[in-house]
Amino acid sequence: MKFSTDRIITTHAGSLPRPPELLKLIRAKVAGQPHDEKGLEAEITSSIEQCVKRQADIGLDVISDGEFSKPSFLSYIVERLDGVTPTDEPFGQPWKGSREHNQWSEYYAWEAQVGIALAPVTATKRVVCSGPVKYKGHDKVKADIARFKAALGKVKVEEAFLPAISPTQVEFWIRNQHYKSERDYIFALADALHDEYKAITDSGLLLQIDDPRLVTQYVMDASMSIADCRKWAEVRVEALNHALRDIPEDKIRYHTCYSIDMGPRTNDMEAKDIVDIILKIKAIAYSFEGANPRHEHEWKVWNAAKLPQHKVLIPGVITHSTVLVEHPELVCDRILRYAQGLGRERVIAGADCGFGTFAGMQTIHPTVAWAKLEALVEGARMASRQLWGRAAA
């Protein structure tokens, strides 16, 4: 993976706003309505090509396919696994009963009435693990890779990455009804997902592991203490590292965040309580929230953490948690805090979270999301001028 050797390079968290026509076709497929599968595939290909070009045009260095082939960053995995069964049971509201919902129930009731009008395009029924888990998505991940690399062949960027879901997140999404223990289940998922991870890195692309649940378990399960969550997280990190076996560390970036909730967020697990466990994950780079009001101050925690010398951080310097477009000078200041603590070569400028995590659920309008990414690029150029004493390329 490339580092910021002569300037601060830029990236983001993976998902980007999907075009309206693509959303329409994805919505029809997820709803089980008649749709043109060939037309959908063609639209995915065209949309990825446009997305890749736009990322390159605004100056992003390390880019993704926008996750345009997936209804969401996690539900896509259901059709890539054997041993899972959809049910008629509603998935429900995962935030209900969480620490956040319990403290701010009046706010969330109000938000439900006046908040986001667009429902996410994703499965609303519970999926269960009903048998041995095996990966069967080889053709689908090959198609993702082929589409992305075809689009990359038409632009000039530093590197490219494909996101893939973590075993821990799948464990949350697909309820275990087959394995005797949580440990057996999470390691079975790790074995299955290894195939997807290795296919991505074998193609020459970087792999990004998407793992919000590692830090959201604390807020989601009000019965667990910090100590409980740390013990729980240790097992999940062990399983993830098992899934990443025989994959070169320098091909892996790890992303965690506190979800797309735009609520008060006063119950988020603090970085100081989990950073040492995160750094046990086999990855060359760690992407995390660093630009929103609940976590911006944690640059001090990350700078003080014992990050191995050969690894880098990808702090969020723009955020999905507000529609305000960050001023490039603010982006620059955020980058400088990390660079002054870790060294300029060990910082890559990133985003807190994706801007299209669930197709159709847009807390940030596409025009605003792209403006934020432009501010990210300009802020990185400003930081580069200060850190290297010359204009960035």
Language-model features, listed with the residues they occupy:
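Domain-level signal for soluble alpha/beta catalytic cores
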Residues: 1-393
